[in-house]
């Protein structure tokens, strides 16, 4: 009986999607679901509205209120535009950055969002093609925008897409703006969405921002001399078909690394991710092609970025010469250990310097910070909280690095989200520093364990998609 009531509710909701407010393709898809005797798909697509949460939208693509499509994306953008026009009504021309990753429909959603923002009188800086999430964050700050969005579902399977919303500091939206935007989005009906854009308010950006961003990333190198000595460090990199495919190799080259090998099959931009089960750099399977290449050429390090190039996975050889994955906690530990030790060694460390980690990230980082008399701040899970700590201390202290166990790291304050572009370059420098001492990254990790203690951890993912699996 309960199931019959649910079918009745979703049928009534779906029938509203057969009106002229929706395009013919969408109407045909909804009609097909309504006529199908098996109502499972209809239920999944309409049993709720895709929720615009504090991080934006994320969901499976398709027709329906519980799917990522031009109408759910349109409502999110219209709601954000309404809030921006309220919040900054006395600030002159409001502007936003719009970016996207390699996923199917990401460009379409980005262009539709640009049209909606411009139709609401908001100037749009639209990236010409896919770009890393951290570059979107950088562009918001660099161009003095009030907000920005990136169309991406990070490392989720190919069926998904998503919508990340950012505020004027380049960080994901926090209170009080997050709940206020949600309220605005929830008020929007399909008739409210202004799909007809104002092309005069849309400006295409690309290489101009790339150049400034890469110059800033290059300035993060702590020990350029060690790179000069180890410029032939053998690096294997894969973007997993995503947004890191141009800027990460370019950054490595700019830092001085001359022996970078990209996995050719995975340098191809594709939202279908044809060479992997899931484009998640945490998974061994996603790095398998890169590791095979590394074995052939006897590489020193393997790195993989996810589709929007904000997270990085890494592998290196252990003490037996076998390739092993370095998990997020270990990578974050290596990352911050190197920054601290070498800033001290090069005389760059200042009393006001601080690092940040999330509460679920290894406590060995605190041990390193304490022994070296560096302030370490714990924050809630999620990189927006690391960004919050940076913002709270602006003008008083200097952020020098942070990260989380979920493979997100940030060495700079000119970006306010995790950054695989700078992380890959700095991790390569760490590998060069190790090799300069006749060591591997694995050896450095063992040295840290000897000096600061040992810890071991594992992550268990539980996936329960849809109404009927709850």
Regions found by a protein language model. Give the residues of each.
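N-terminal small/polar loop signature for handling phosphorylated ligands or for N-terminal nucleophile
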Residues: 97-160, 258-314
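Gly/Ser/Thr-enriched, mixed-charge loops and adjacent short helices
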Residues: 17, 21, 25, 41-45, ...
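Conserved phosphate/anionic-ligand binding catalytic regions in large, soluble enzymes, centered on
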Residues: 46-66, 153-156, 235, 239-251, ...
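Active-site phosphate-binding/coordination module
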Residues: 135-191, 307, 405
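Glycine-rich phosphate-binding loop plus the immediately following alpha-helix
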Residues: 166-194, 329-353, 357-367, 420, ...
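Phosphate-binding and adjacent anionic-ligand microenvironments
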Residues: 295, 299-301, 322-324, 342-470
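An N-terminal, well-structured beta->alpha segment
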Residues: 7, 11-113, 203-232, 243
């Amino acid at each position: 009986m309960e199931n019959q009531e649910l079918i009745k509710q979703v049928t009534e909701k779906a029938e509203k999607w057969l009106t002229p407010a929706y395009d013919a393709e969408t109407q045909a898809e909804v009609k097909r679901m309504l006529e199908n005797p098996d109502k499972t798909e209809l239920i999944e697509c309409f049993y709720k509205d895709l929720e615009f949460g504090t991080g934006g939208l994320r969901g499976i693509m398709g027709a329906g209120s519980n799917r990522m499509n031009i109408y759910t994306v349109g409502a999110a953008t219209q709601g954000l535009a309404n809030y921006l026009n309220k919040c900054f009504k006395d600030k002159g021309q409001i502007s936003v950055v719009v970016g996207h990753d390699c996923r199917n429909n990401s460009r379409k959603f980005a262009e539709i969002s640009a049209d909606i923002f411009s139709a609401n009188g908001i100037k749009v800086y639209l990236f010409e093609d896919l770009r890393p999430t951290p570059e979107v964050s950088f562009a918001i700050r660099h161009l003095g925008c009030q907000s920005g969005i990136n169309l991406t579902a990070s490392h989720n399977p190919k069926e998904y897409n998503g919508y990340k919303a950012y505020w004027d500091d380049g960080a994901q939206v926090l209170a009080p703006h997050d709940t206020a935007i949600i309220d605005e989005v929830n008020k929007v009906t399909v008739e409210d969405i202004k799909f007809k854009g104002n092309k005069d308010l849309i400006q295409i950006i690309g290489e101009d921002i790339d150049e400034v961003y890469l110059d800033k990333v290059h300035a993060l190198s702590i020990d350029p001399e060690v790179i000069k000595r180890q410029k032939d460090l053998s690096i294997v990199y894969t973007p997993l078909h995503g947004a890191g495919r141009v800027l990460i190799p370019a950054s490595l080259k700019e830092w001085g690394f001359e022996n970078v090998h990209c996995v050719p099959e995975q340098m191809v931009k594709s939202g279908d991710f044809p060479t992997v089960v899931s484009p998640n750099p945490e998974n061994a399977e996603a790095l398998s092609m890169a590791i095979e290449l590394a074995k052939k050429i006897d590489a020193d390090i393997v790195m993989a970025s996810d589709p929007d190039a904000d997270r990085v996975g890494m592998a290196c050889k252990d003490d037996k010469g076998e390739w092993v994955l370095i998990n997020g906690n270990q990578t974050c530990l290596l990352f911050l250990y190197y920054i601290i030790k070498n800033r001290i060694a090069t005389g760059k460390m200042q009393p006001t310097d601080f690092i940040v980690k999330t509460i679920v990230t290894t406590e060995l980082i605190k041990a390193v910070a304490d022994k070296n008399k560096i302030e370490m701040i714990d924050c809630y899970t999620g990189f927006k909280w690391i960004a919050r700590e940076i913002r709270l201390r602006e003008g008083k202290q200097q952020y020098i690095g942070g990260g989380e166990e979920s493979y997100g790291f940030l060495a700079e304050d000119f970006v306010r989200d995790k950054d695989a572009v700078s992380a890959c370059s700095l991790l390569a420098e760490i590998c060069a520093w190790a090799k300069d001492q006749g060591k591997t990254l694995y050896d450095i990790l063992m040295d840290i364990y000897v000096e600061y203690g040992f810890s071991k951890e594992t992550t268990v993912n539980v996936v329960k998609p849809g109404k009927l699996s709850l």
